[in-house]
């Protein structure tokens, strides 16, 4: 079951997982785990990701 859409939004925004990891100060493997839905980010981190990608948090968790 997919719980987040981070990977899809990264593709839409043409931002790599490596770029996002650097901007968040996280490792690539952590971001990759979020993108693969192996781990879920906290709401606080999800909000940071939304800010970086210029989307609302809802766009990261549900289909439009």
Where are these regions (language model features)?
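Residues within the alpha-helical elements of helix-turn-helix
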Residues: 12, 23, 52
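A short, Lys/Arg-rich alpha-helix, primarily the initiator
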Residues: 1-15
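Recognition helix of helix-turn-helix/homeodomain-like DNA-binding domains
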Residues: 25-40
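DNA major-groove recognition helix of helix-turn-helix/homeodomain DNA-binding modules
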Residues: 44-59
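Residues in the helix-turn-helix
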Residues: 19, 30, 59
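Short alpha-helical "recognition helix" segments of helix-turn-helix
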Residues: 20-21, 49
């Amino acid at each position: 079951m997919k719980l987040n859409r981070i990977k899809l939004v990264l593709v839409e925004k043409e931002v790599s997982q490596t770029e996002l990891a650097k901007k968040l100060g996280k490792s690539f493997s952590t971001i990759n785990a979020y993108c693969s839905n192996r781990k879920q980010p906290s709401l606080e981190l999800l909000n940071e990701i939304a800010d970086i990608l210029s989307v609302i948090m809802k766009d990261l968790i549900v289909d439009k």
